[in-house]
């Protein structure tokens, strides 16, 4: 579950035998470090082999469709960072002596309170759009970039496909948050074969989410946290079970009460599935997939399917840039893109890096600073590259 917590309930659910095995497994991992040639070894070094098998292996394989043994440790370095079993335990021991509102020097995976927009993150971008338009800017929606025009080591414009035909836009500076695979393919320049091949083969995982409005959850709140209608306090729950394909469950009531119309009598949840465009899950009809998702949650005891009041399904392409396949040669692609003096790659897909929203925003800020002379191009790429940045907040 998230926020991550270690408690008597956690140990009770694991059982005495598993807890002892986890403890000895962690001590072994501390004494005999593995070379971090894969995500598997990265996890084992921080949590021990028993906890890796219990909590990380199956979920990670659901997420990426590939066993962690074949995934670069870079993903762990960006997402898990300094978090380990010892730090999780230390956080529990320090908790009585730390104010609940003080998140300084705390691993963010362990933070229990954080700022969240009243009506969800989309509200932030609605506000940004309003500010852009107030300042005289314009935002073109539903336009697919077909061609990136280049000349003399610079990007000169883009050609888009829009509802009423093709249009061309020119500019002085270009910020790209489109998937690098698509960016390189759209360039009208003679891209080196090795770069073009690497970019074309960059792997991604696609994403399906199902929103369910239900009368209640069957799982109970066994914590001391008070919640409306006493629902479980988790923001999301990771699902490790092999016999279901759901990877994660979000409980929107706990993100913000303003996102649920009838907070006291309904629960708004989001089921998350990781897949590949064109596979069996992706190709299912909305109605069939919603029934499939309801059945999975009922199977693992989260809901009674009869309690579902409403449902919606959303598919997202290239939601997760992946760290296997041609990713090993990604530095060659980066070096090529950096030869365009007025092009800055920003965001998660724009850098083929599993950034969170805050880091994606920061890449844009760093790009603007680089243009204004208060920084350099490397600063943009180096966001979330420092090992301690992502999961530890010092201020």
What residue ranges belong to the model's regions?
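Dinucleotide-binding Rossmann-like beta1-alpha1 core, especially the glycine-rich loop
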Residues: 1-31
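C-terminal lid/capping helical subdomain adjacent to the catalytic/cofactor pocket in oxidative enzymes
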Residues: 314-317, 324-395
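A short coil-to-beta-strand element that immediately follows conserved catalytic motifs
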Residues: 207, 303-315, 378
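General small-molecule cofactor/ligand-binding pocket signal
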Residues: 138-140, 309-312, 344
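Active-site/ligand-binding neighborhood in enzyme catalytic cores
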Residues: 19-151, 170
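Mid-domain catalytic core of redox enzymes
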Residues: 141-301, 329, 381-388
């Amino acid at each position: 579950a998230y926020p991550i917590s270690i408690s008597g309930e956690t140990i009770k659910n694991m059982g005495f035998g598993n807890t002892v095995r986890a403890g000895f497994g962690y001590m072994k991992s501390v004494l005999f470090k593995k070379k971090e040639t894969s995500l598997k070894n990265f996890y084992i070094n921080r949590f021990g082999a028993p906890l890796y098998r219990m909590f990380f292996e199956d979920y990670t394989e659901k997420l990426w469709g590939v066993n962690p043994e074949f995934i670069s440790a870079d993903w762990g370095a960006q997402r898990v960072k300094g978090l380990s079993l010892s730090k999780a335990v230390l956080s529990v021991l320090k908790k009585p002596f730390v104010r609940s509102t003080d998140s300084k020097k705390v691993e963010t995976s362990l933070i229990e309170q954080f700022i969240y927009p009243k009506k969800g993150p989309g509200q932030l971008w609605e506000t940004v759009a309003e500010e852009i338009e107030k300042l005289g800017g314009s935002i073109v929606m539903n336009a697919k970039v077909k061609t990136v025009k280049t000349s003399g080591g610079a990007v000169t414009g883009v050609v888009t496909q829009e509802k009423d035909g093709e249009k061309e836009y020119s500019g002085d500076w270009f910020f790209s948050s489109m998937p690098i695979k698509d960016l390189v393919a759209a360039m009208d320049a003679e891209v080196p074969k090795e770069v073009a091949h690497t970019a074309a083969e960059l792997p991604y995982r696609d994403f399906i989410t199902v929103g369910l409005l239900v009368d209640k959850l069957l799982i109970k709140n066994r914590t001391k946290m008070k919640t409306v209608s006493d629902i479980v306090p988790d923001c999301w729950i990771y699902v490790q079970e092999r016999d279901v394909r759901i990877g994660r469950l979000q409980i929107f009531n706990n993100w913000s009460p303003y996102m649920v119309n009838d907070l006291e009598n309904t629960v708004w949840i989001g089921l998350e599935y990781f897949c590949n465009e064109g596979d069996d899950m992706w190709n299912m009809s909305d109605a069939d997939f919603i029934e499939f998702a309801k059945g999975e949650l009922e199977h693992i005891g989260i809901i009674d399917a009869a309690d579902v009041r409403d449902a919606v399904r959303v598919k997202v392409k290239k939601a997760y840039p992946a760290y296997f396949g041609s990713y090993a040669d990604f530095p060659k692609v980066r070096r090529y893109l950096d030869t365009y003096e007025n092009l800055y790659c920003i965001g998660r897909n724009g850098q083929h890096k599993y950034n969170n929203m805050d880091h994606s925003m920061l890449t844009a800020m760093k790009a603007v600073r680089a243009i204004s002379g208060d920084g350099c191009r490397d600063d943009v790429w180096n966001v979330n590259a420092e090992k301690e940045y992502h999961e530890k907040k010092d201020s």
